Amino acid sequence: MSSNKINKKSIARIAAVQAIYQNILQNNDDMDDIMQNVLSFYQNNNSITDLPENLKISLSISHFKMLVKLVFENIHKLDEIIDNHLTNDKDPAHMPILLRALLRVSICELLFCPTTPAKVVINEYTDIANDMLNEHEIGFVNSVLDKIAKEHTRLI
């Protein structure tokens, strides 16, 4: 039986979204505590249920830590960018927590990780959104990331 693996950076992105979600949900600003909680979950594959036997999950710890740290360092700028992309009838205070977490991490990677092509960032986080959010929110994530990529003149 062959072993399947998911890209380590893809898992790191999912884990970073989960860490930022935990930060918002628990109002916990202890970045090290949050990172340790999420890392311990991923490092113990036995705690991940519903996986095929031959699927191996591991994440790029360095990419995960970099994303979480960058979000914490730039959280106010990221929220300002997110809020500026809402339509007039949308109240930032009513944005679903998971959507805000995903946008914080994805916009952060788009703006502060220039070695990752914008097209890769947009595709990765749209795929993550597809697994976590509803259809309207998926389209919103794709649209916001595309606009931000164009605004910041990165090639997509």
Curated annotation (Swiss-Prot):
The keyword Cytoplasm is assigned to this record: no
GO process annotations (BP): DNA-templated transcription termination; transcription antitermination
One GO CC annotation: cytosol
InterPro entries: NusB-like_sf, NusB_fam, NusB_RsmB_TIM44
An example Gene Ontology molecular-function term: RNA binding
Record keywords: RNA-binding, Transcription, Transcription antitermination, Transcription regulation
Keyword Transcription: yes
Function: Involved in transcription antitermination. Required for transcription of ribosomal RNA (rRNA) genes. Binds specifically to the boxA antiterminator sequence of the ribosomal RNA (rrn) operons.
Family membership: Belongs to the NusB family.
NCBIfam families assigned to the protein according to its UniProt record, in alphabetical order: nusB
Name of the protein in its database record: Transcription antitermination protein NusB
Organism of derivation: Rickettsia rickettsii (strain Sheila Smith)
Lineage of source species: Bacteria, Pseudomonadati, Pseudomonadota, Alphaproteobacteria, Rickettsiales
